[in-house]
């Protein structure tokens, strides 16, 4: 498999239904099984690529600790970011302008997801989903790492890396893309502001790739400070059906050149490898 693109010969409705039906499990309607908006809508299943793609296409994501059964969530409200609305702070712009760091796409997925899985006490700060459960090894345990690494191998899960001027990985993020939406999973930083630069890089990449919404799942102060907003679950699911049927640029290991951090503030898009 690879990232789905509607070839134009299939109606958007049929295309969306095809993606939703990929898995072998029938997920329930969130509004029916969770009318109070607590967030959890199903228990069980597996983390096979087809199951995950089907779940994400229906607005669900897995969230569970290592010693718990697989739980599927569709929170109310939903935290999202529109790439065109993102405005970095003045201090981050100043930092980027004088930085000698660079960003890459899909060059160190294994390292990024491993760094995101480390407890904060290890000197690694995991920023994206602070509201999610943090156990001994956080919620990104071996089963999750294996599942998303396979999604990466199949072309769905993607990472953005931040490298310092000595070539050390100091920050990054990962998530998956279906059509015109990117589902953010987690990000980390070892050096100050590295995850903010990774997020800015994601916004730039999405803006120039026809990815019109980034799903941040659960709101927290960090995300809201970056310009995220919340949507009702109903509104999010309505937009999701439209977005997953949209075509967007293909992201793979060699699709984009490294991006010097000072270029984040320019109008120049993240350059493709031609």
UniProtKB/Swiss-Prot annotation:
GO terms for cellular component: cytoplasm. Pfam families: Leu_Phe_trans (PF03588). GO terms for biological process: protein catabolic process. GO terms for molecular function: leucyl-tRNA--protein transferase activity. Keywords: Acyltransferase, Cytoplasm, Transferase. It is found in: Cytoplasm. It catalyses: N-terminal L-lysyl-[protein] + L-leucyl-tRNA(Leu) = N-terminal L-leucyl-L-lysyl-[protein] + tRNA(Leu) + H(+); N-terminal L-arginyl-[protein] + L-leucyl-tRNA(Leu) = N-terminal L-leucyl-L-arginyl-[protein] + tRNA(Leu) + H(+); L-phenylalanyl-tRNA(Phe) + an N-terminal L-alpha-aminoacyl-[protein] = an N-terminal L-phenylalanyl-L-alpha-aminoacyl-[protein] + tRNA(Phe). Its EC number is 2.3.2.6. Functions in the N-end rule pathway of protein degradation where it conjugates Leu, Phe and, less efficiently, Met from aminoacyl-tRNAs to the N-termini of proteins containing an N-terminal arginine or lysine. PANTHER family: LEUCYL/PHENYLALANYL-TRNA--PROTEIN TRANSFERASE, LEUCYL_PHENYLALANYL-TRNA--PROTEIN TRANSFERASE. Belongs to the L/F-transferase family. This is Leucyl/phenylalanyl-tRNA--protein transferase. It comes from Psychrobacter cryohalolentis (strain ATCC BAA-1226 / DSM 17306 / VKM B-2378 / K5). The gene is aat.
